[in-house]
């Protein structure tokens, strides 16, 4: 074993070990998150969160005011207000650092496996030279032998090999990668465990799957999504409005012959602006991306995840998504005048050279239920399946055995469909109507009978589609099956619509039709022919084991190559949007409640008429403002777990979700400040801090 092979194996081992040991529990991340909370006090970092930048500026101002004598505000009270303003900023920074910490633990383990990799790059003269993997550019060709690591994302242009993708997918079983077809794409930092591959690099440094995955989980470097930018604008607008409100209070107080200390006005501003959502907004987005990474899905941008939350239509391939995809032989039906033994012998011979899962299932079925003497494989002349003939079988001892699609088999023996025996025709129709696939068996110009291949619908898929329907999402099954078979499986699975005998052009046309009617569309695919539809869809998820063209066209890549993951991505997207909306509602409701709770307590001495609004009966203006500041800081801490976990989206339509969230987070946001501020006021008064 050469040095490069040994180094590659060591790198893979260390990567897996670190990935396994990387602790992402909250308890293990608290200390580094606390340290990062102080680092993030740098105003340059807070520029991404305008609301919290305002809070930090008020904390600085209040701290300075502590050194300015003011008979209206005891120094001890001013100092407490300053401390709690700093705590407010630190708590918000802590929430963001905690969300980032979970992603960074994963990023560190991913980075560890990619360090120190080398590659055998092909020169112009056809020879190979050893270079550092990070120097490779798009279009370079490298040779990867058994035991070596694939240095970057690319396309197999020559060779067939087993590849261990555990460093990326976590799945230890090797997968086959070969040139041509839909299994030609390879991912950097995976290991060839047998044979060799010639790979054309498809991504420049910093653009590979691994690089995108690391960038995704390192939340601090991510770009804000359009929804986050829009929400930032709203929060800035509310901050300016409340700033104007607070500024006008000073003249009102002076006009009435009273006075409001500057410390109180600064603190009042912080209690009124939307600090709750302002402090948690970044953590919500980072935690949402982290949930996506835990699903082993990487996104090229946050836009795709947000779009997934707003999707109206899901286009899902039948095979592998709705059904298991491994059709199995479940029954044989003999034509009139043909014995069961003759049909079994013909079906077995027509399937002996068929290495597809369907062909193997027919052989297994017949060996168990209809055992017959089999000829040796070398005596057979195999006839492979082709898209033109849609038949496969063997020639043996001058005899011809074929099996295939109904129309293809009938055409092979020159038998019109209307002359097909009625009893067998009825059985074929029953198979198709039940969702199965009928194959006809013919031998030497005779029709022997039919084979029933059954495709099993995945358990629980009907219930998942029902949940999506209650969320207002329509599901469309895409299949190459005939309309009868497609309709039967669609009815069993519970999808809303079906595209039978689908082609890439049909998929693309359906996506454009839905988008033309104002709906967002999501789909998944893996082949080069899926690339146009993946690029057109609002959310396109490519399989990691698919072609490079599909992965480049999509805005999401599933490293596990599981098409059903699209349903989970939609769930994550909805949770992200609902969490952001719920906490925004809670924060704004908080501000409204605090406005009516605190202002009467501050002004009752200046305007006695406001006593009727002073429902909380706070002990004094000092205790009122201090209680509000303490509540304002502590509510951020209380909501950190919800921001990181996300609001669970239950199966309900949009109006029900809105009513539920308005009740919980809207009404809750109005009530919580009254209860919380009153409780803190009593506590501060009892211990003599106000």
UniProtKB/Swiss-Prot annotation:
One of its GO terms (biological process) is potassium ion transmembrane transport. InterPro entries: ATPase_P-typ_cyto_dom_N, ATPase_P-typ_P_site, ATPase_P-typ_TM_dom_sf, ATPase_P-typ_transduc_dom_A_sf, HAD-like_sf, HAD_sf, P-type_ATPase_bsu_IA, P_typ_ATPase. GO terms for molecular function: ATP binding; ATP hydrolysis activity; magnesium ion binding; P-type potassium transmembrane transporter activity. It is found in: Cell inner membrane. Gene3D superfamilies: Calcium-transporting ATPase, cytoplasmic domain N (3.40.1110.10), Calcium-transporting ATPase, cytoplasmic transduction domain A (2.70.150.10), HAD superfamily/HAD-like (3.40.50.1000). The active site is at 317 (4-aspartylphosphate intermediate). The chain crosses the membrane at residues 49-69, 72-92, 229-249, 253-273, 596-616, 624-644, 662-682. PROSITE patterns: ATPASE_E1_E2 (PS00154). Keywords: ATP-binding, Cell inner membrane, Cell membrane, Ion transport, Magnesium, Membrane, Metal-binding, Nucleotide-binding, Phosphoprotein, Potassium, Potassium transport, Translocase, Transmembrane, Transmembrane helix, Transport. It catalyses: K(+)(out) + ATP + H2O = K(+)(in) + ADP + phosphate + H(+). ATP binds at residues 354, 358, 385-392, 403. It holds the Pfam family E1-E2_ATPase. The keyword Calcium does not apply. Belongs to the cation transport ATPase (P-type) (TC 3.A.3) family. Type IA subfamily. Part of the high-affinity ATP-driven potassium transport (or Kdp) system, which catalyzes the hydrolysis of ATP coupled with the electrogenic transport of potassium into the cytoplasm. This subunit is responsible for energy coupling to the transport system and for the release of the potassium ions to the cytoplasm. HAMAP family: KdpB. NCBIfam families: ATPase_P-type, kdpB. This is Potassium-transporting ATPase ATP-binding subunit. The lineage of its organism: Bacteria, Pseudomonadati, Pseudomonadota, Gammaproteobacteria, Pseudomonadales. The gene is kdpB.
């Amino acid at each position: 074993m050469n040095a490069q092979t040994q180094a590659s194996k060591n790198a893979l081992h260390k990567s897996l070990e670190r990935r396994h040991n990387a602790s992402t529990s909250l308890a293990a991340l608290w200390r580094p998150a606390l340290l990062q909370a102080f680092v993030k006090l740098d105003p340059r970092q807070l520029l991404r969160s305008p609301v919290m930048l305002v809070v930090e500026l008020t904390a600085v101002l209040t701290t300075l005011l502590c050194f300015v004598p003011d008979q209206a505000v005891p120094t001890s009270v001013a100092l407490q207000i300053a401390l709690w303003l700093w705590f407010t900023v630190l708590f918000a920074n802590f929430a963001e650092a905690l969300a980032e910490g979970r992603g960074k633990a994963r990023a560190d383990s991913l980075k560890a496996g990619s360090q120190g990799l080398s590659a055998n790059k092909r020169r112009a003269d056809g020879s190979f030279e050893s270079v550092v993997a990070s120097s490779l550019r798009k279009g370079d060709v490298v040779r990867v032998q058994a035991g070596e690591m694939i240095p970057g994302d690319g396309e197999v242009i020559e060779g067939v090999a087993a590849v261990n993708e555990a460093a990326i997918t976590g799945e230890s079983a090797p997968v086959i990668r070969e040139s041509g077809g839909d299994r030609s794409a390879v991912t950097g930092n995976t290991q060839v465990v047998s044979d060799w591959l010639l790979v054309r690099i498809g991504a420049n440094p910093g653009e590979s799957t691994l690089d995108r995955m690391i960038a995704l989980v390192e939340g601090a470097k991510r770009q804000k999504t359009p929804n986050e930018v829009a929400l930032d604008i709203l929060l800035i607008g509310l901050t300016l409005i409340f700033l104007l409100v607070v500024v006008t209070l000073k003249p009102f107080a002076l006009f009435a012959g009273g006075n409001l200390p500057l410390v109180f006005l600064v603190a009042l501003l912080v209690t009124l602006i939307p600090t709750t959502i302002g402090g948690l907004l970044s953590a919500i987005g980072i935690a949402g991306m982290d949930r996506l990474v835990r699903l082993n899905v990487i996104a090229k941008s946050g836009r795709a995840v947000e779009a997934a939350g707003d999707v109206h239509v899901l286009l899902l391939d039948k095979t592998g998504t709705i059904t298991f995809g491994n059709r199995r032989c479940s029954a044989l039906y003999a034509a009139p005048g043909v014995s069961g033994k003759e049909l079994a012998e013909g079906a077995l011979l027509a399937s002996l050279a068929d290495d597809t899962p369907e062909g193997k299932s027919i052989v297994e079925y017949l060996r168990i239920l209809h055992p017959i003497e089999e000829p040796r494989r070398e005596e057979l002349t195999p006839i492979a399946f082709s898209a033109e003939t849609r038949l496969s079988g063997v020639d043996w001892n001058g005899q011809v055995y074929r099996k295939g699609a109904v129309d293809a088999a009938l055409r092979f023996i020159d038998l019109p469909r209307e002359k097909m025996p009625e009893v067998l025709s009825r059985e074929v129709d029953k198979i198709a109507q039940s969702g199965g696939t009928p194959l006809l068996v013919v031998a030497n110009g005779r029709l022997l009978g039919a084979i029933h291949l059954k495709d099993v619908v995945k358990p629980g898929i009907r219930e998942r589609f029902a949940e999506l329907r209650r969320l207002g999402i329509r599901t469309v099954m895409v299949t190459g099956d005939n309309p009868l078979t497609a309709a039967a499986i669609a009815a069993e699975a519970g999808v809303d619509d079906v595209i039978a005998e689908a082609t890439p052009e049909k998929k693309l046309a359906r996506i454009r039709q839905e988008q033309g009617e104002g709906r967002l569309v999501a789909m998944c695919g893996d082949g080069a022919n899926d690339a146009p539809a993946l690029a057109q869809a609002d959310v396109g998820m490519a399989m990691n084991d698919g072609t490079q063209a599909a992965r480049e066209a999509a805005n999401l890549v599933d490293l596990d190559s599981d098409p059903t993951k699209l349903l989970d991505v939609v769930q994550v997207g909805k949770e992200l949007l609902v969490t952001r909306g719920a906490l925004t509602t809670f924060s704004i409701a908080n501000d409204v409640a605090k406005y009516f709770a605190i202002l009467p307590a501050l002004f009752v001495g200046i305007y006695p008429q406001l006593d009727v609004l002073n429902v909380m009966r706070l002990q004094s203006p000092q205790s009122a403002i201090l209680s509000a500041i303490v509540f304002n800081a502590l509510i951020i801490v209380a909501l950190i777990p919800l921001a990181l976990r996300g609001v669970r989206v239950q199966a309900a339509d949009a109006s029900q979700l809105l009513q539920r969230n308005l009740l919980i987070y809207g009404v809750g946001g109005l009530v919580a400040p009254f209860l919380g501020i009153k409780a803190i006021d009593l506590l501060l008064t009892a211990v003599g801090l106000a």
